[in-house]
Amino acid sequence: MNKKIILTALFALFTLSASSTTPDSIKAFLADFDSVVYMAEHDYAPFKFKVTKKNEKEYNALKKQLVKDITKGKRTWQDAVFAYVGWFGDHHFYVFGDNKDVYANYSKYARKRIEYRKQMDEYHSQPMSCKVDDDTWLIRFPSCDKTQEWAEQAAREYKASGCPNLIIDIRGNGGGQDDSYWPFFLMLFDTPDCSRDGVVFRYTEASIKRCGLTEERLKSLGLPTDFANAPEYLVWIKDGATFTYDSICTFPKKAAIIVDNSVASSGEQLVLDARLASKRTKIYGRDNTLGCVDTGSCPHYIIARRGVTIQYPMAYSTRWEKGTCVDPTGIAPDVRIPLPCPKRLTDNIDEWVLWVAEDLKR
């Protein structure tokens, strides 16, 4: 009995001693890492789909190993955060910081994408609206970030052109706001009453505060202000919501959307909407899109004293619930372009555009 008491006392003393010898700096690093884990587990929208019974042991082992590595000085707390966030493989969930090295180092752990700049002499897609030939008009739309006004102008130019065929080239379009592509979608739409996938918020007080939404703004949006009694998962767009418009545009007769592996988020949503509601539109490309469209509405979690910021999605598509996710495989083109990458993609009419223009004439 006395032997057991002595052993217990020695163990307690050893534990206390080990704890007391942990430097304050390491404790601070661990606290920062733990705060990121807490945010992911309590605010990251698709967490319950990302960590399941199948991979729960792997996830817990990763956390344990990263804490151990920080404690023993085998890796920095930043590197542990990079490895942790990268494990989820979600391009809407990523790390950046006060200098470009933060994102560069995080990218080592992020889900890989095709690096077209290594395959081409110049990869810098720029907005274009011009005639390819007598039958075909090209709109190159490389971003959905605050570009709706430009899109409206490009749509007007196409309508005035008289060209029966339209190519919308969205290579390199990493997203932005869905409203930006709406002028194009309204031209492509030809299938009334087709139903969209829904959107669900993981509705936490922390995320709402990070978005900067006031109580008045929440009320104007019809969202709960009593977080204690609000549902954790709140349906924002009901699954099966339909597209219905008053008219269908006569032109284009045929349409193409050109994609690549850099197309993501709102860029991919344009592809999904067109595939759903436009029978006259085909998707062309060599590679699948990135696969970054099943999450969204992203606030920032800032670790101010460390110069590190984490973007994470507070919303997910109901495709997660239905097992029909686009992420992470991306959207496959309807037609695979049988050509290598062009040497240049800037403000030029490249080989892919010419090939697609000919294919639309068939």
Indicate residue ranges for each PLM-predicted region.
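Conserved active-site loop/cleft motifs that coordinate metal ions or position small ligands
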Residues: 311-313
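Flexible, low-complexity junctional segments that flank or bridge functional domains
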Residues: 20-223, 251-254, 280-282, 289-305, ...
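Cysteine-dependent hydrolase recognition
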Residues: 215, 222-239, 245, 263, ...
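Cell-envelope and extracellular/periplasmic
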Residues: 171, 251, 257, 331, ...
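Residues that cap or initiate secondary-structure elements
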Residues: 145, 174, 263, 316-318, ...
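Sec-dependent N-terminal signal peptides
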Residues: 4-17
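Flexible, glycine-rich surface segments
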Residues: 230-299
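Active-site rim recognition segments
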Residues: 315-349
